[in-house]
Curated annotation (Swiss-Prot):
Name of the protein in question: Holo-[acyl-carrier-protein] synthase
Family the UniProt entry places it in: Belongs to the P-Pant transferase superfamily. AcpS family.
The EC number(s) this enzyme carries: 2.7.8.7
Biological process according to GO: fatty acid biosynthetic process
Organism of provenance: Aquifex aeolicus (strain VF5)
UniProt keyword Transferase present: yes
Amino acid sequence: MIGVDIVKNERIKDALERFGDKFLDRIYTKRELEYCYAHCDFLPCLAARWAGKEAVLKAFYTEFKIFLRFKEIEILGNRGRPPTVVINREGVEEILKNYEVIVSLSHERDYSVAVAYIKKKS
């Protein structure tokens, strides 16, 4: 199953300016924030992860009929390699033993985009 999302980076900037740490704490995990602060241009990094979480959420719901919250989806950076997706939700471990969640993130100027793919492990 595939999920796709695109977000205007300005939208994330507006949410950050309006809600501050409350927004960050509700959407992103500690490890995601640490990565974005340390390794990337902060705003596009956040926006790409927002799009990634949306894409994973869409693919996950379509495949399994399980609605995930943003903070239950963790997209961890791997400099030079594809990001790692971790689902932090009780009860899905059994499902994920047989599936792999793959995400690709990108950002360019004003937009960030993500594609998520859930595939059965071989």
